[in-house]
Amino acid sequence: MRLFLNNEEPRAKSFDTYAKEVVSFGAGKHSESFKKNGSYVTMACPKCHRKITFEYYNNDGIGSFRCKNCGHSGSEKADYSVENTDFERRKFTLRGTEFRMPYDTPYMLYNYSAAVAVAEKFAGIAPEDAAKAFDTFKNVGGRFEILRYKGKTIKYMRIKQENPETLQTSINVMASDSERKMVCLGLCPLVDLITHYANTF
């Protein structure tokens, strides 16, 4: 079995012992990477349940990590790693090929590296050929869209809020945008719809 795993996400990387072949994807440190001080809660190691430390984060819960107890960590560099990220020019390199960045948000870097990894390993599409598709790539509508209306730019982000990290990452993206802005947060309560999954016989 071949697994494509995020090299910088501790839970995903912990599956590396379950496959004959692991293809890792990730992103190197870039201008939007950040550190947290000791007052922030960190996640438990998925292998030994002790504290994981991050050298830096590329997104909340994703970055260069190591468990000091069991040694669980990402490789120094993923097999498919986004490097030389330039958010202003909207460019990055991956396996020596320059790519245009359709969406200049840090969390998309992992989608880009995963897509190139799957394209080459699964479909035989070389990175230089995959780079051509990035020129016309459009994200699925409704998740992250940039709209223009009456001279204003509207950046619409919708998240499923599976965990606090997804909300925090979205807030980080908004905060890192230096443009003057108005922010509207619409939070929907998460309700437990037990009748949809419980045995009701």
Regions found by a protein language model. Give the residues of each.
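A short glycine/serine-rich beta->alpha loop
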Residues: E98-P106, K155-Y156
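A conserved, hydrophobic alpha-helical segment in the catalytic core
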Residues: I62-S75, Y103-D135
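Extended acidic/charged loop-beta regions that coordinate divalent cations
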Residues: K13-R100
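Short beta-strand segments
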Residues: N6, G26, C184-C188
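Active-site beta-alpha connecting loops in nucleotide-dependent enzymes
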Residues: V140, R158-F201
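Gly/charged, well-structured mid-domain segments that form the phosphate/adenylate-handling core
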Residues: T85-F87, A119-I159
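Short, charged/polar "capping" segments at the starts of alpha-helices
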Residues: E9-S14, S31-S33, V191-H196
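N-terminal alpha-helical interaction blocks
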Residues: M1-Y18
